[in-house]
């Protein structure tokens, strides 16, 4: 009986843990190229204005499904990214982004025109499309990535 309950619990956990979506593209920064392979959409409160809900697109080289599923607060979701790009959608008139490389030792953040993200799907459960950034003029990255990001986490606390 206990074994049956354990198997049922494991099956339920696997079914409720959202998996990564796909990303196909690159992030290039000062000669280093990262192949982006995984895409996630996270929804939760803004750190500055917790009454405001934002969407966060996370694009990474590594699969962070389990780590993101374990997050209980919004600030955890970007802290898990060691190599990739985090883009805040709905945070203001521009897209806010944060790039990290080499286990977060290299970082760059800036904003982009909303037109740099061309969505083919944009609903409560998924964001898909193309993101193109060329921020080399301010020391930032060049990003060209097609993505299909399912909603993997909807959080209620910013921190």
Predicted segments with their positions:
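Bacterial N-terminal signal peptides that target proteins for export
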Residues: 1-8
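Hydrophobic h-region of N-terminal signal peptides that target proteins for export
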Residues: 10-19
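Edge beta-strand at a domain terminus
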Residues: 21-22, 27-30, 130-159
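N-terminal targeting signals for Sec/Tat export/insertion, comprising classic cleavable signal peptides
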Residues: 30-53
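Amphipathic hydrophobic-ligand
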Residues: 32-36, 109-113, 141-146
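Surface-exposed helix/loop patches within compact recognition domains
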Residues: 47-122
């Amino acid at each position: 009986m206990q074994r049956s309950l354990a198997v049922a619990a494991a099956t339920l956990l696997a079914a409720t843990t959202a998996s990564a979506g796909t990303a196909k593209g690159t992030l290039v920064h000062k000669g280093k190229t990262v192949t982006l392979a995984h895409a996630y959409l996270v929804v939760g409160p803004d750190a500055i204005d917790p009454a405001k809900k934002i969407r966060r697109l996370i694009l990474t080289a590594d699969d962070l499904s389990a780590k993101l599923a374990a997050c209980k607060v919004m600030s955890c979701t970007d802290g898990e990214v060691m190599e990739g790009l985090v883009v805040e959608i709905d945070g203001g008139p521009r897209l806010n982004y944060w790039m990290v490389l080499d286990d977060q030792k290299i970082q760059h953040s800036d904003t982009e025109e909303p037109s740099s993200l061309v969505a083919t799907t944009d609903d409560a459960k998924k964001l898909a499309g193309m993101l193109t950034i060329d921020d080399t003029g301010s020391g930032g990255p060049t990003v060209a990535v097609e993505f299909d990001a399912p909603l993997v986490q909807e959080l209620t606390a910013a921190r």
